[in-house]
Amino acid sequence: MGGSVIHKINLATFEKELLQIGSNPRAIVLSPDNSILYATLNSSGRVVASDLATKKLIKSVKTGSASRSLDISSDGSALYVVNFTSDTISKVRTSDFKVLQKIKACNEPIGITYEPLHKRVWVACYGGAIKVFSDSLVR
């Protein structure tokens, strides 16, 4: 945490590119086609999208307080975000960055993963619990 850039490193040449992403990035995921980098910005409670070809920030949305971890659906249509101090998870549609759903998860959620086979969202809570939610919301 800290800073405002993501370092993209070419593993063949070790050349480094810097992507300006916003203050205090916490977690990142790539779109299924590797063209968009999604990141949580912990201090502002936002999720941002950066086009990797243009290196430009293209979308941003507030999801809660202290956005931490995130995951993406297998088809790339939705992001799932845990918001640590607001004790919630948010579902964001990637096409327009609309928050489709925000629900109480647990006290201080810190990790999240999307399970495509059964369309479930698994959430790790700071106190040690694991919560499982059905992703039944229509996209």
Question: Can you describe what each PLM-predicted range is?
Answer:
Residues 1-139:
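Predominantly soluble domains enriched in secretory-pathway, periplasmic, or organellar proteins
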